[in-house]
Protein backbone atom coordinates (compact mmCIF):
# COMPACT_ATOMS: atom_id res chain seq x y z
CA UNK A 1 0.00 0.00 0.00
CA UNK A 2 2.87 2.36 0.81
CA UNK A 3 4.42 1.67 -2.62
CA UNK A 4 1.16 2.63 -4.35
CA UNK A 5 0.88 5.81 -2.26
CA UNK A 6 4.50 6.80 -2.98
CA UNK A 7 3.98 6.12 -6.68
CA UNK A 8 0.89 8.35 -6.68
CA UNK A 9 2.86 11.03 -4.83
CA UNK A 10 5.66 10.75 -7.40
CA UNK A 11 3.21 10.99 -10.24
CA UNK A 12 1.53 14.07 -8.75
CA UNK A 13 4.80 15.86 -8.01
CA UNK A 14 6.32 15.13 -11.37
CA UNK A 15 3.11 15.90 -13.24
CA UNK A 16 3.27 19.44 -11.89
CA UNK A 17 6.85 19.70 -13.10
CA UNK A 18 6.01 18.07 -16.40
CA UNK A 19 3.47 20.77 -17.11
CA UNK A 20 6.26 23.34 -17.04
CA UNK A 21 6.74 22.30 -20.63
CA UNK A 22 8.66 24.66 -22.87
CA UNK A 23 7.39 24.96 -26.42
CA UNK A 24 9.01 26.34 -29.53
CA UNK A 25 7.64 26.60 -33.02
CA UNK A 26 9.50 24.70 -35.72
CA UNK A 27 10.73 28.04 -37.09
CA UNK A 28 12.58 28.63 -33.81
CA UNK A 29 13.83 25.05 -33.55
CA UNK A 30 15.05 24.32 -37.12
CA UNK A 31 15.04 20.58 -36.37
CA UNK A 32 15.24 18.67 -39.66
CA UNK A 33 14.04 15.46 -37.99
CA UNK A 34 10.61 16.98 -37.43
CA UNK A 35 8.13 15.38 -39.86
CA UNK A 36 4.57 16.47 -40.69
CA UNK A 37 2.23 15.18 -38.00
CA UNK A 38 5.06 14.72 -35.50
CA UNK A 39 6.28 16.65 -32.47
CA UNK A 40 9.74 16.67 -30.90
CA UNK A 41 9.57 15.48 -27.30
CA UNK A 42 12.49 15.91 -24.91
CA UNK A 43 12.85 14.70 -21.32
CA UNK A 44 15.32 16.55 -19.11
CA UNK A 45 16.27 15.70 -15.52
CA UNK A 46 17.34 17.79 -12.52
CA UNK A 47 17.53 17.29 -8.74
CA UNK A 48 17.14 19.23 -5.52
CA UNK A 49 20.31 19.17 -3.37
CA UNK A 50 20.44 16.43 -0.72
CA UNK A 51 22.57 15.10 2.14
CA UNK A 52 24.25 12.36 0.11
CA UNK A 53 27.59 12.28 -1.66
CA UNK A 54 26.07 10.49 -4.68
CA UNK A 55 22.64 9.28 -5.74
CA UNK A 56 23.10 7.12 -8.82
CA UNK A 57 20.24 5.92 -10.98
CA UNK A 58 20.73 3.59 -13.91
CA UNK A 59 18.53 4.74 -16.81
CA UNK A 60 18.01 2.03 -19.42
CA UNK A 61 15.07 3.47 -21.36
CA UNK A 62 12.60 6.33 -21.37
CA UNK A 63 9.26 5.66 -23.00
CA UNK A 64 6.06 7.61 -23.49
CA UNK A 65 2.51 6.41 -24.01
CA UNK A 66 0.89 7.99 -27.05
CA UNK A 67 -2.76 7.71 -28.01
CA UNK A 68 -1.55 7.28 -31.61
CA UNK A 69 1.15 4.58 -31.32
CA UNK A 70 0.83 3.22 -27.77
CA UNK A 71 4.21 2.85 -26.04
CA UNK A 72 7.03 4.64 -27.86
CA UNK A 73 10.66 4.19 -26.79
CA UNK A 74 12.46 7.53 -26.99
CA UNK A 75 16.09 7.69 -28.06
CA UNK A 76 17.57 7.50 -24.57
CA UNK A 77 20.98 8.54 -23.27
CA UNK A 78 21.40 5.36 -21.23
CA UNK A 79 23.77 5.08 -18.32
CA UNK A 80 24.23 5.72 -14.63
CA UNK A 81 23.46 9.30 -13.62
CA UNK A 82 24.48 10.88 -10.32
CA UNK A 83 21.39 12.97 -9.59
CA UNK A 84 23.47 15.34 -7.47
CA UNK A 85 25.34 16.43 -10.61
CA UNK A 86 22.09 18.06 -11.72
CA UNK A 87 21.21 20.42 -8.88
CA UNK A 88 20.97 24.19 -8.52
CA UNK A 89 19.59 24.88 -11.98
CA UNK A 90 21.66 22.28 -13.83
CA UNK A 91 19.81 19.66 -15.86
CA UNK A 92 20.63 17.06 -18.49
CA UNK A 93 18.87 15.71 -21.55
CA UNK A 94 18.08 12.02 -20.97
CA UNK A 95 15.79 11.33 -23.94
CA UNK A 96 14.59 12.95 -27.14
CA UNK A 97 12.73 11.88 -30.26
CA UNK A 98 10.09 12.85 -32.78
CA UNK A 99 6.82 11.15 -31.94
CA UNK A 100 3.37 11.27 -33.54
CA UNK A 101 1.42 14.33 -32.46
CA UNK A 102 -1.58 13.61 -30.29
CA UNK A 103 -1.93 12.94 -26.59
CA UNK A 104 0.93 11.69 -24.39
CA UNK A 105 -0.49 10.32 -21.16
CA UNK A 106 2.53 8.86 -19.39
CA UNK A 107 6.33 8.85 -19.24
CA UNK A 108 8.21 5.86 -17.84
CA UNK A 109 11.79 5.73 -16.63
CA UNK A 110 12.97 2.12 -17.02
CA UNK A 111 15.81 1.67 -14.52
CA UNK A 112 18.55 -0.94 -14.43
CA UNK A 113 20.21 -2.67 -11.49
CA UNK A 114 23.13 -0.25 -10.96
CA UNK A 115 21.28 2.17 -8.67
CA UNK A 116 23.26 3.24 -5.61
CA UNK A 117 23.69 5.88 -2.94
CA UNK A 118 26.96 7.01 -1.33
CA UNK A 119 26.71 7.95 2.35
CA UNK A 120 29.75 8.80 4.48
CA UNK A 121 32.06 7.46 1.77
CA UNK A 122 30.30 4.08 1.58
CA UNK A 123 28.37 2.97 -1.50
CA UNK A 124 25.07 1.17 -0.85
CA UNK A 125 22.66 -0.46 -3.31
CA UNK A 126 19.56 1.65 -3.93
CA UNK A 127 16.43 -0.45 -4.40
CA UNK A 128 13.52 0.88 -6.45
CA UNK A 129 10.53 -1.13 -5.21
CA UNK A 130 7.75 0.82 -6.93
CA UNK A 131 9.30 0.82 -10.38
CA UNK A 132 11.67 -2.10 -10.57
CA UNK A 133 9.67 -3.99 -13.20
CA UNK A 134 7.63 -1.51 -15.20
CA UNK A 135 9.58 1.67 -14.49
CA UNK A 136 8.90 4.87 -12.59
CA UNK A 137 5.61 6.17 -13.96
CA UNK A 138 4.77 9.83 -14.50
CA UNK A 139 1.26 10.90 -15.51
CA UNK A 140 1.56 13.88 -17.86
CA UNK A 141 -1.45 14.20 -20.22
CA UNK A 142 0.13 16.44 -22.87
CA UNK A 143 -1.65 17.25 -26.12
CA UNK A 144 1.08 17.57 -28.75
CA UNK A 145 0.62 19.92 -31.68
CA UNK A 146 2.56 19.05 -34.86
CA UNK A 147 5.88 20.81 -35.50
CA UNK A 148 6.28 22.01 -31.90
CA UNK A 149 9.15 20.98 -29.62
CA UNK A 150 8.12 20.00 -26.10
CA UNK A 151 10.56 19.74 -23.19
CA UNK A 152 9.61 18.07 -19.92
CA UNK A 153 11.77 18.77 -16.86
CA UNK A 154 11.64 15.96 -14.30
CA UNK A 155 12.86 17.19 -10.91
CA UNK A 156 13.90 14.36 -8.60
CA UNK A 157 14.13 15.29 -4.92
CA UNK A 158 16.82 12.90 -3.67
CA UNK A 159 16.78 14.27 -0.12
CA UNK A 160 13.09 13.43 0.30
CA UNK A 161 13.00 10.33 -1.93
CA UNK A 162 15.63 8.09 -0.34
CA UNK A 163 14.62 6.13 2.73
CA UNK A 164 16.89 4.14 5.04
CA UNK A 165 14.91 1.08 6.13
CA UNK A 166 15.07 -0.54 9.56
CA UNK A 167 17.33 -3.28 8.19
CA UNK A 168 19.91 -0.81 6.84
CA UNK A 169 18.86 -0.82 3.18
CA UNK A 170 18.30 2.27 1.08
CA UNK A 171 15.21 2.48 -1.11
CA UNK A 172 14.13 5.07 -3.67
CA UNK A 173 10.58 6.23 -2.99
CA UNK A 174 10.24 9.36 -5.13
CA UNK A 175 8.07 12.16 -3.76
Language model: regions and residue ranges:
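A short, solvent-exposed, low-complexity linear motif enriched for acidic/polar residues
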Residues: 24-175
Amino acid sequence: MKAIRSLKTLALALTVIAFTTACQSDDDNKNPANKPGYSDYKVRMTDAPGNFTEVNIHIQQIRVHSDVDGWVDLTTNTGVYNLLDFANGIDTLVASDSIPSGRVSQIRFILGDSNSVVVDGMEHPLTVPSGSQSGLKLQVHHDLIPNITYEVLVDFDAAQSIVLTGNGKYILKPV
